[in-house]
Regions:
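Solvent-exposed interhelical
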Residues: 45-96, 169-215
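Membrane-embedded alpha-helical segments that form the functional core of polytopic membrane enzymes
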Residues: 23-56, 103-111, 156-177
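Select subsegments of transmembrane alpha-helices in polytopic membrane proteins
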Residues: 10-17, 76-86, 134-142, 201-208, ...
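Intramembrane alpha-helical segments
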Residues: 71-155
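The first (N-terminal) embedded transmembrane alpha-helix
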Residues: 7-29, 141-147
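Short, Lys/Arg-rich, polar N-terminal cytosolic tail immediately upstream
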Residues: 1-8, 123
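Hydrophobic alpha-helical transmembrane segments in multi-pass integral membrane proteins
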Residues: 143-155, 213-217, 264-279
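Extended hydrophobic alpha-helices typical of membrane-associated regions
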Residues: 65-73, 124-133, 202, 220, ...
Length: 279
């Protein structure tokens, strides 16, 4: 990979790390057992996990078998370093400093993130699961939604599950937005993404509807009505994001920066409500 390709890659992976940490911190604010070691462990494990999952996904582009993907992934010295420090530092730290709930949810998030990168044999041909309609988007939505539960640990706050559902829907929307600039690539690669199947315009209409309905999770329980404002602010941010994509679907400002910024807005709103004593 040359220098010109390295720069956008590291920028993109940095955005993913920042967005994932924003969701971890959103859940951590609800955690009843906040310690600096737990905080640092969550940061290290999440950052390493994001690099591993998304780089392994890049290695699956040619419908290689899962073992072939692993071999290709490990040929990169940076990947070797990330895996080594994950085994030597992250796993022991997670085992000793994370509660069972956080450890389990973090493992599930990692497995879901890897799930859509796996290739299976269908009719004698290797088929990447991410090529199947919506499999990738649902996996990403659930995996990132689980990050909230990872941060929260064994907390049983009534706001936690609605927040998990809300984040999962919003990240699902975001994953489809990231597919918008790749319609031609998906066509060539046989990936059945939503924009490829429905087209950009209809896909955006579906996403607008999902965005509008996503905040309903905060009004199911009357005791959580205060959180509706949180949901509406995020929904408005996403509405602006989708409008930008409607006019410039291939512009990375809308499909990457503003899109991933949704996770930061979620954290900001959770933090404000936390400081106000509502959480």
């Amino acid at each position: 990979m040359n220098a010109t390709k390295e720069k956008p890659y590291f920028l993109r992976i940095t955005l993913f790390i920042v967005a994932s940490l924003a969701l971890i911190f959103s859940g951590f604010l609800l955690n009843n057992d906040k310690t600096i070691l737990k905080f640092l462990t969550l940061m290290l494990c999440t950052s390493s996990g994001v690099v591993i999952v998304y780089r392994l996904n890049d290695a699956s582009g040619n419908s290689l078998s899962f073992m072939a993907q692993i071999v290709k992934f490990l040929q990169n010295k940076f990947h070797q370093f990330v895996i080594a420090q994950f085994i030597v530092f992250c796993l022991p730290l997670a085992f000793f400093y994370l509660d069972r709930q956080s450890f389990f949810m973090l493992s599930m998030a990692g497995l879901l993130g890897l799930f859509y990168t796996v290739s299976v044999r269908i009719n004698g041909k290797s088929q990447a699961l991410k090529k199947i309609f919506l499999v990738k988007n649902i996996s990403i939505g659930l995996a990132w939604g689980l990050l909230v539960l990872v941060g929260a640990g064994e907390t049983t706050h009534p706001f936690l599950f609605p927040l998990f559902c809300f984040v999962s829907v919003q990240v699902f929307i975001g994953s489809v937005i990231r597919d918008l600039p790749d319609v031609n690539y998906d066509e060539e690669s046989g990936i059945r993404s939503l924009p490829r199947i429905l087209g950009t315009r209809k896909s955006l209409l579906v996403l607008h509807l999902m965005n509008a309905l996503s905040c309903l999770v905060f009004i199911v329980d009357k005791e959580l009505n205060w959180s509706l404002i949180l949901g509406l602010v995020v929904v408005f941010w996403r509405f602006v994001n989708l409008l930008g994509c409607a006019f410039q679907p291939r512009n990375l400002i809308w499909s990457q920066f503003v899109n991933l910024g949704t996770c930061l807005v979620i954290f900001l709103m959770v933090f404000i409500n936390y400081r106000l004593g509502l959480i």
